[in-house]
A protein has these predicted regions:
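Non-catalytic substrate-recognition and accessory regions of acyl/acetyltransferase enzymes
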Residues: 1-81, 85-144
């Protein structure tokens, strides 16, 4: 179920309950006065072999372990300054760090609308063969 949750962003923010009992971690960009301009949340997860992209599922068990980008939002006042791209890069860097120490294959996101899907595709995410709004980025393709 999507809801605005009081955060003035360009789109809606999905509430999936992923932070119940510490199941996710949220990372926030704010100014000195505490005004939030953007945030994202990440959680551990898995994707079925059939729903994974070919490159993600290759030589992996079923289900395939992933990091889930549960939310990413930018305040409408911070639109146009590439804050979303910076937040995404930080999330990718954190997921890569996890993948170097644990068996995590990809970063997975559920895009809420076509604009969000295009944003993630621009940064190399690929569409799930079963769920067009589920996108994945194989982490070893972004390692330095």
């Amino acid at each position: 179920m999507a809801r605005n949750s009081g955060f003035p962003c360009a789109g809606t923010v999905a509430s999936h309950g992923r932070n119940i009992h510490g199941a996710s971690r949220t990372f926030v960009v704010n100014d000195r006065e505490g005004r939030v301009y953007g945030y994202y949340a990440m959680a551990a997860g898995a994707v079925s072999y059939q729903a994974a992209t070919r490159s993600v599922r290759r030589n992996m068990p079923d289900p395939v372990p992933v990091m889930v980008l549960a939310r990413l939002a930018v305040d409408h006042r911070a639109q146009g300054i590439k804050l979303g791209a910076a937040l995404l890069q930080d999330a990718v860097n954190r997921a890569v760090a996890v993948s170097q120490n644990a068996g995590v294959r990809a970063l997975l996101v559920h895009a809420l609308h076509d604009g969000a899907k295009q944003f993630y595709e621009h940064y190399g995410f690929q569409e799930s063969p079963q769920h067009p709004m589920t996108l994945m980025l194989r982490l070893n393709t972004v390692r330095a």
